[in-house]
Each structure stands twice: as structure tokens, then as C-alpha cells.
């Protein structure tokens, strides 16, 4: 007899960012999901040349939540916690982003990874090293890929969600979960 499965619980979300516009779209999705699940959100940036001190260039949490109408303009970090989420920012000084992300996820496993993915075609596919898919595959973590040049289902301006279609890939091998 099959036991009843409990609803999906996501308590930790990981969002690697390169600070591009595409990553800003993925950030909005990661933040909105963290709010929905009352989860911890870890935002990570890997750079070979930037000092690990300071996080001024990271996506701005409180201004985003204020724009979404969830916090007042003059909110504090404590106000973010009252929304039921916890934010961690990680900067890795490394030349190999894939290796740094895999190392971080091995030390601090996550339930869901949300990241932008760039769809290269033709010759460009040979020149650019894929990051999103290999990390997801190697770490075997649930992943929300936010393709480049799309707005996705979360409005960056309002935080409102709009989902019309959902595609679930199903595979016999490996067994679906």
C-alpha cells in the first residue's frame, strides 16, 4: 500500500547570480518562492577578481520587498525576518564558478536551486561553458531554470505571480520522484 506523501516542503533555496538582467529575473523568482515557503534564501556570486568583503552589488532584498508592498521603505533586517524568511549572501573568490557552486552546495545542501540559464545555439554553444544544467545534474537538486530573455511567472516590479502553463518532464530512468 502506498503511503500518503506529505506536501512538498522547501526550507532552503539557493540562487547563484552573475548580476546580469537575467539573474535579476531569477532572483525575483527565488525571493518570491522563499516568501511562499517561508524558506531560507542563499544568494551566491562567484568572481575571480572581486574582494569577498561587502555585498553592495548583490540584489537588494529590502527595496525589492518594499516595491512589492510587503515592507515599508525604511525597513530593517528584522522586518525581513518577520516575513518568515532568512537571507544569506555568499561571495566566493574563485575562477571556476561551477566548482565553487558545487563545493558550496556539498557543504550546505539545498532543497531548490533557482537560476538563470542562457540558451546558446550553434557556434555560441561551443564558445560558452554551460553552468546551470551541469550543476543541477551533478548535485541532483530540484531546479527552477529561468531562461534568458523571459520575464518568467514572477513580476520583478510587483512580486505578483502569473502562471499559465507548466511543463513537468517525466522520465522512466532515473525514476521520477
What label would you give each PLM region?
Residues 1-4, 32, 102-155:
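Gly/Ser-rich helix-loop-strand patches that form or flank binding pockets
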Residues 2-62, 162-177:
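Small/aliphatic-rich secondary-structure junction motif
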Residues 30, 76, 101:
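Aromatic/hydrophobic pocket-lining residues that form π-stacking "cages" and hydrophobic walls in ligand
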Residues 50-51, 58, 97, 122, ...:
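Generic structural signal for helix capping and beta-alpha/helix-loop junctions
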Residues 80-88:
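A short helix-to-beta-strand connector/capping loop
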Residues 90-100:
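Charged docking surfaces used in two-component/phosphorelay signaling
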